[in-house]
Amino acid sequence: MTSILLVAHDSPYGSERLYNALRIALATQEHAETPVSQKLFLMSDATVAALSGQQTPDLSYHIGQMLEILLAQGVEIAVCRTCAEARGLSQDRLIEGITIGTLVDLTRHTLAADKVIHI
């Protein structure tokens, strides 16, 4: 089984970088010919994407729903603890199933992954 680690850094709205990263993750889950193990690690401003109860005014895309779909597909999602704390985020404010991880966790995932993508 191929393992992929996707590390995202940009805020969920205002730029489409995180949106496109999640589109890649969704497409990989849905169209891979062989089983794929994916992990998503949100850092910097991307951590706020994990907030539960998001409402998008224009309904063009909903990052929270995309994360929930990935969780339902078995993708492990974590946010950087240091980055989350700097933004006032705690576990109880995150979408159910998303965890808070550390740099050590990210390092382990990086060393174990067949492919690492930073977006």
Spans of model-derived segments:
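Short internal beta-strands
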Residues: A25, S37-S44, I77-R81
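Short, glycine-rich nucleotide/cofactor-binding loops
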Residues: L5-A21, A50-Q55
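Acidic, glycine-rich active-site loops and adjacent beta-strand->loop/helix elements
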Residues: D10, S44-V48, C83-E85
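Short glycine-enriched, charge-decorated loop/helix-capping segments at active-site entrances
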Residues: G53-D58, L94-E96
